[in-house]
Amino acid sequence: MALRGSHRLEVIFKRCIASPVFHSHAANRRSSQLAIKGTDPSSNGNSGQDQQNGEQKAKGWRRLVRFFVPFSLGAAVSAAVIKREDFTPTIAASKMTGRRRDFNFIADVVAGCADSVVYIEIKDTRHFDYFSGQPITASNGSGFIIEQNGLILTNAHVVINKPHTMVQVRLSDGRTFPATIEDVDQTSDLATLRIQVNNLSVMRLGKSSTLRSGEWVVALGSPLALSNTVTAGVISSTQRASQELGLRNRDINYLQTDAAITFGNSGGPLVNLDGEAIGVNSMKVTAGISFAIPIDYVKVFLERAAEKRKKGSAYKTGYPVKRYMGITMLTLTPDILFELKSRSQNMPSHLTHGVLVWKVIVGSPAHSGGLQPGDIVTHINKKEIKNSSDVYDALADNSKNLDIVILRGVKQMHVTITPEDP
């Protein structure tokens, strides 16, 4: 390949030499050099020595081309990367031809609904960044606009994390606004926010009842705080009961998808190929297993919230009486354990129960104590943990510290956490 590339470069260089422009400049340079030396450029008194010198120069040019041009190309590529904002693609889909036009259906979906997706940050008003002096980001998530006057839908666990926080929303165009919480249903894990701005792009709501397993879907959001991220997959199941996931007090049949969803995607939309939201991204168990709240269930929540607004009953910030640890967790049911063991060789074969930690709030007691996403809690204060209810019961206990036994991969570890009082 290297020889073939060098040969092509030589051909290109020879063509350049053959061009009139090259010869005109070359002739001018030769005339100038000969004039300086006091030699007549039209003289034909050159000998065989001159011909030999010309051949040596030609060989030198070839070596120079082989060495210099690849580095020139590399420099050009580097310059293109550095100045990539100057070359943002602006080709409309209607101007594309061939397969790009016929098969890029995911791009068509994104073009129609991405502007309505927002990035949500939860700021801790008690802790400030050393350099900027601004409140630090305690956690983040996603949401999407459902009314032009600034009403935003998201997950309750995104905005209800702990006391002494404020909510900020960043739109797809980069504008940032403070947000107020309008309504929260912690049982269904849904919430609405309001920002004071009008004429916003709105996400259309579809019907989750018409979904079929195997349908293409697109997940939009801000995983790991990376705004405007797009992933795609299919609906794995339309009827994944909350009891199968070990979620207490929830009577929801979740949508299961293999679209990549991770931390920060929570609250973002799961969209069908018509550009309609058919679910709200809620949780991830492992790669290829994620869940979303069906949009039909969300519509019931929105109707109730609208009735409350008509009656003038505003949402009052209320935090759980239980102590705060700072994790989002999922009960390991037999079905989920089977999926995890089939996908990962690091899962202990003897594991039959526990709670999976899939998110840890930065700066929380769990974070300070060393708990990490992916840890599996099996015991707290020597009591066996079989589901998330057992963890809540442990938090309700008056013990100052929680001695937690976890599985991290195949290793069993102990971490000590001191929950915050409400």
Swiss-Prot record:
The keyword Isomerase does not apply. SUPFAM superfamilies: PDZ domain-like, Trypsin-like serine proteases. GO terms for molecular function: serine-type endopeptidase activity. Residues 1-17 form a transit peptide. It is a single-pass membrane protein. The keyword Transmembrane helix applies. It catalyses: Cleavage of non-polar aliphatic amino-acids at the P1 position, with a preference for Val, Ile and Met. At the P2 and P3 positions, Arg is selected most strongly with a secondary preference for other hydrophilic residues. A motif (IAP-binding) lies at residues 75-78, 94-97. Interacts with th/DIAP1 (via BIR 2 domain). Belongs to the peptidase S1C family. PANTHER family: SERINE PROTEASE FAMILY S1C HTRA-RELATED (PTHR22939), SERINE PROTEASE HTRA2, MITOCHONDRIAL (PTHR22939:SF129). This is Serine protease HTRA2, mitochondrial. The lineage of its organism: Eukaryota, Metazoa, Ecdysozoa, Arthropoda, Hexapoda. The gene is HtrA2.
